Design a protein with these regions (language model features):
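Short, charged beta-turn/beta-strand-edge "cap" motif at the junction between a beta-strand
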Residues: 15-19
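Short aromatic-glycine-enriched beta-strand elements
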Residues: 36-38
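Intrinsically disordered, low-complexity, charged/polar segments
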Residues: 40-83
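Short beta-strand-centered aromatic/proline hotspots
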Residues: 20-32
Length: 83
C-alpha cells in the first residue's frame, strides 16, 4: 500500500531514472494503485511565485520505492493557505 493519497503533492524520484541519475520532481497524485501511481507533473515553484502552474499530461509512473519520496502538501493544505 502506498503512502500517497489522491490530491497529495509529492516529491518523488521517477522509477525510470537510471542508477546514479538524480532528479526528484514534484507531482500531483491523481490515482494510486500501490505499485503504480497516476501523477501529473507540476512546477510547484511556479505556484508559489505566480499562483498558477504549468500543466503537463498525466501519466502512470512507477515511483522509485525510495525513502526520500515524500508528501510535500495536500490540495487541502493549499486551499487553506498552508503553503
Amino acid at each position: 500500500m502506498s503512502k500517497f493519497k489522491v490530491g497529495d503533492i509529492i516529491k518523488a524520484r521517477p522509477g525510470w531514472l537510471g542508477p546514479g541519475e538524480t532528479g526528484e520532481e514534484r507531482y500531483l497524485v491523481l490515482e494510486d494503485r500501490g505499485n503504480k501511481t497516476l501523477v501529473q507533473y507540476i512546477d510547484v515553484d511556479h505556484i508559489f511565485s505566480f499562483g498558477s502552474t504549468h500543466v503537463y499530461a498525466d501519466e502512470w509512473m512507477e515511483l522509485d520505492p525510495n525513502p526520500s519520496n515524500e508528501v510535500l502538501m495536500t490540495v487541502t493544505d493549499m486551499a487553506n493557505g498552508k503553503i
